[in-house]
């Protein structure tokens, strides 16, 4: 997973 997945999962 990427750090952005925690802010905008998808």
UniProtKB/Swiss-Prot annotation:
Gene Ontology cellular-component terms listed: extracellular region
Entry's localization field: Secreted
List residues modified as Pyrrolidone carboxylic acid.
1
Which protein, by its recorded name, is this?
A: Gonadoliberin-1
Give the tissue specificity: GNRH neurons lie within blood sinuses close to the gonoducts and gonads in both juveniles and adults, implying that the neuropeptide is released into the bloodstream.
Its biological purpose is as follows: Stimulates the secretion of gonadotropins; it stimulates the secretion of both luteinizing and follicle-stimulating hormones.
From the Swiss-Prot or TrEMBL record, what is one GO molecular function term? hormone activity
């Amino acid at each position: 997973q990427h750090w952005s997945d925690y802010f905008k999962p998808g």
